[in-house]
């Protein structure tokens, strides 16, 4: 890896416990015989400042928090100025607060060093917040390559749509019927479905933001009988069932008082609504 110009950082940090922070960062440079000790230590201090651990140079790994240890591991990986930095689930061992902090730090470090960085993660939030481009894999096969927002807004298939998004996208089985989607007793008109053959089995994907409450002067696409509602921070979500599947949508403040059992007329927005082939998972609309 060293000869290929690749720096590695893993989730377990892999720091030498008997060495100080300074010695750990300097260690990859020891093989450079032409590099004087003062130059190695200057490089170590430069990297320590980059990852903001310069005040911890004389401490050993056992005296550092998990986040601090990961910063040192990144500094050590950057010591030899690699062409590529590979981060293999580097935040898995950190608690939620530190993960958020380190996500921001890794993004900053990459932007300051301009080193091409490959970040391996199973966490969609990490992928979406850190990356310029996401490669989404399933069973070793590439499902989609796109910028984070494009991946969210324009999923290539059912797997991509269900992998990204919190709360997750709601998937309802349906059938194309006379240019519309029939799901159970409900029929929904969706632009683009009219081009699909009658009787085709599909999956209807609805993100929380895809539904809004219909105004009094307009027709509704669906009538939701509210099963429950709950609050996540500043957002209120209501839950109803469509052909036995749970569907969620955001409640505006003016009707946040609705109760279980109430009927609410809904309209589909122009975004967050997808139609997938039920067998292949390919996105159709």
What residue spans do the PLM features occupy?
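ABC ATPase nucleotide-binding domains
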Residues: 1-159
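Ser/Thr- (and often Asn-) enriched beta-sheet segments in non-cytosolic proteins
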Residues: 4, 175, 180-182
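Short glycine-rich loop/turn motifs that provide flexible caps or phosphate-binding loops at active sites
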Residues: 6, 27, 65-66, 139, ...
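Residues that scaffold the ATP/ADP-binding catalytic core of kinase and kinase-like folds
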Residues: 101, 154, 162-163, 214, ...
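ABC transporter nucleotide-binding domain
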Residues: 147-178
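Non-catalytic connector elements of ABC transporters
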Residues: 167, 171, 180-285
């Amino acid at each position: 890896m060293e000869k290929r110009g690749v720096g590695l950082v893993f989730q377990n940090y892999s720091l030498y416990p008997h060495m100080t922070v300074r010695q750990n960062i300097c260690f990859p440079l020891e093989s450079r015989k032409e590099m004087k000790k003062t130059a190695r230590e200057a490089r170590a201090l430069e990297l320590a400042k980059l990852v903001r651990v310069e005040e911890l140079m004389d401490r050993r790994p056992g005296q550092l928090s998990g986040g601090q240890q990961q910063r040192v591991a990144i500094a050590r990986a950057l010591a030899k100025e690699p062409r590529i930095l590979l981060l293999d689930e580097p935040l898995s061992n950190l608690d939620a607060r530190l993960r958020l902090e380190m996500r921001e730090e890794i993004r900053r470090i990459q932007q300051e060093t301009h080193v091409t960085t490959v970040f391996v993660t199973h966490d969609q939030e990490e992928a979406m917040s850190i990356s310029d481009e996401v490669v989404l894999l399933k069973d070793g096969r590439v499902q989609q390559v796109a910028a984070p927002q494009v991946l969210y807004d324009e999923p290539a298939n059912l797997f991509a749509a269900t992998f990204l998004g919190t709360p997750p996208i709601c998937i309802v089985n349906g059938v194309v019927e006379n240019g519309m989607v029939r799901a159970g007793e409900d029929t929904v008109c969706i632009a683009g479905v009219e081009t699909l053959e009658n009787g085709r089995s599909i999956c209807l994907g609805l993100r929380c933001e895809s539904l809004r409450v219909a105004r009094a002067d307009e027709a509704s696409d669906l009538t939701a009988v509210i099963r429950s509602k709950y609050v996540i921070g500043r957002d209120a979500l209501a839950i109803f069932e469509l052909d036995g599947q749970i569907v969620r949508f955001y409640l505006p403040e003016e009707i946040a008082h609705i109760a279980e059992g109430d009927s609410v007329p809904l309209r589909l927005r122009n975004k967050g609504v997808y139609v997938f082939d039920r067998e292949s998972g390919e996105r159709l609309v």
